[in-house]
Amino acid sequence: CRLVGSEMCIRDRDADVILIGEMRDRETMETAIRAAELGQLVISTLHSPSALGALSQMITAFPEDEREIGRMRVADTLRAVVAQKLLPRKDSDRQIPAVEVVRITGAVRDCILHGKPSEEIIELTEQGSAAYGTQTFQQQLESLVEMDLVDYEVSKAAATSPSDFELIMQTLSDERGRLGEVPVTGEELGA
């Protein structure tokens, strides 16, 4: 059954998992949420530059007068949002994904419900990396540079905030220098 906003696919199939290639319109998002409300696992894609951008797109797909209910429905059904950017590897012609993972924990759910700023969700995502396996693009980009897999300038350009990325990388490099370790970004940071 092709799920193109079709309620029939949800009702007529006893599927545990529904895969939606891409949620391009409100009708498809509405159907996906309804399926999740019925207990089915729904996996889909959405074109967005970040996990928070995808979350925002889902909420703003609801008309203004339904947005509060939309927030509740999204917060109640969403379990995680994963975003990726493909970056060129330093050591080959291949690409490597920089991945952002936002799990919908109780605290993140509250942020969605109450329309709190995305900065709070980013902070919760950073703090939850050990407990929930979450990470921001910033954390992933730092890690890729530290592991010498991606060029510093490429990571900086891919960062949500290049100036913040540069400041954090400089701070990490300074801390390592004080400890007698190799700077985070090697020779590139001095450039």
Task: Tell where the protein language model's regions lie, with residue ranges.
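Conserved P-loop NTPase
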Residues: T77-A191
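Conserved P-loop NTPase nucleotide-binding/switch module
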Residues: D14-L86
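A short alpha-helix capping/helix-coil boundary motif
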Residues: I10-D12, A35, S118-I121
